[in-house]
Regions:
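The feature captures the beta-strand-to-loop junction immediately N-terminal to the Walker
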Residues: 41-43
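Conserved ABC ATPase "signature" region
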Residues: 72-74, 114-132, 139, 184-185
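Short helical segment in ABC ATPase nucleotide-binding domains corresponding to the A-loop/adjacent helical element
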Residues: 99-107, 117, 121
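Conserved catalytic motifs of ABC-family nucleotide-binding domains
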Residues: 158
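Catalytic Walker B motif of ABC-type/P-loop ATPase nucleotide-binding domains
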Residues: 162-166
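Non-catalytic connector elements of ABC transporters
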Residues: 244-246, 255-355
Length: 355
């Protein structure tokens, strides 16, 4: 599902995990580059957490190989791997201070107290924690502060790879958005390899160098956020990665596609001479005054409008089907609800996915 990298730090070759008759992870091949921020997304039950647990040494593959810098580590215990896992629950010591939590890995290694203290302060600065928090009880920290403590403690292990299991899921939206940017900045500053599991598509798109999409235990597509979003391999990926309009089509000759569930003929870049679906993201649809303003167009009725902060989303009924159109406030629909409208899009803004 991807090209191998010359800077590979982590490789998965046909990795499989079964629990009795249930196949949780099904022959995954993956190559992660050193210093990469790689995120795995997928619906519940897709196998992403089981895959992460195998990488972290908490589960052993039923088949296949996990290689770290070319060395097989399938049976290597988690405490002997140069990796660290940041849990969703954070797993901090609530009865200890911020400094004691961060210093814990260093204390276990026998590092002198003064060296531990200096290192803890260095890590606190890196994760944007005030140095005055060194003696603060973790119990008195906010959710965002505890997240920073957990991250600082993970770096205290000096791991080659940091694994993250949905660490921001329990944090409120505004703070989560701030932490996304900070985590990306920290990744860039340290040059460490990050592997991140999340159900949040926004997190994946904002932070990742590449994204892997899982479904039913399989890694179905790997690519940059731009690739995954604008060039999905199949209909599942297109719909999983965000709102999308899907039109069933069949070939009509002359490079055109004829709508099966909508009237009209459409021109789509890269369309094949076979049945399939035209997929268009809502932001690529626009309101036009005439058919000459776009490669493709459909007439419908605007029947709902939703405010999404800086953007507006419209539902346009075309026959028995509903199209979703998303525009900036500057490009908003100037008419009212239940009024006729012409929705257009260009050939290069749609994707053809064959059946």
């Amino acid at each position: 599902v991807q090209e191998a990298s010359a800077r590979s730090i982590l490789q998965l070759k046909g990795v499989r995990k079964t629990f009795g008759e249930f196949v949780a992870v099904d022959r995954v091949d993956l190559d992660v580059a050193e210093g990469e921020f790689f995120t795995i997304v997928g619906p519940s039950g897709s196998g992403k957490t089981t895959l992460l647990r195998m990488l972290a040494g908490m589960e052993t593959p039923s088949d296949g190989d996990i290689l770290l810098r070319g060395q097989r580590i399938n049976e290597l215990p988690s405490n002997r791997r140069p990796t660290c896992l940041v849990f969703q629950s954070l797993a901090l010591f609530p009865h200890r201070t911020v400094g004691q939590n961060i210093e814990f890995p260093l204390k276990m290694k026998g590092v002198a107290a003064e060296v531990r203290r200096r290192r803890a302060h260095d890590l606190m600065r890196m994760v944007r924690l005030p140095e005055s928090y060194y003696a603060k009880s973790v119990k008195l920290c906010s959710g965002g502060e505890r997240q920073r403590v957990a991250l600082a403690r993970a770096f205290a292990y000096d791991p080659e790879i940091l694994f993250f299991d949905e660490p921001l899921s329990a944090i409120d939206y505004k703070l989560r958005k701030a932490l996304e940017k900070e985590l990306k900045d920290i990744h860039k500053e340290t040059g460490k390899t990050f592997m991140y599991i999340t159900h949040s598509l926004e997190e994946a798109m904002v932070m990742s160098d590449r994204i892997g999409v899982m479904r039913d235990g399989r890694l179905v597509q790997v690519g940059t956020p731009e690739d995954i979003y604008t060039r999905p391999r199949d209909r599942f990926v297109s719909e999983f990665m965000g709102d999308v309009n899907v039109i069933a089509v069949r070939p009509n000759g002359g490079g055109l596609l004829e709508g099966v569930d909508l009237p009209g003929r459409f021109r789509v870049a890269g369309a094949a001479d076979r049945n399939g679906h035209v997929v268009i993201r809502p932001e690529f649809l626009r309101f036009v005054a005439s058919e000459a303003e776009a490669d493709n167009s459909l007439r419908g009725i605007v029947y709902n409008e939703y405010a999404l902060g800086s953007r507006l989303q419209y539902q346009v009924r075309v026959g028995e089907k509903v199209l979703v159109v998303e525009r900036t406030r500057r490009d908003a629909w100037r008419g009212g609800l239940d009024e006729p409208v012409l929705v257009g899009w260009d050939a290069g803004d749609a994707m053809f996915i064959p059946d």
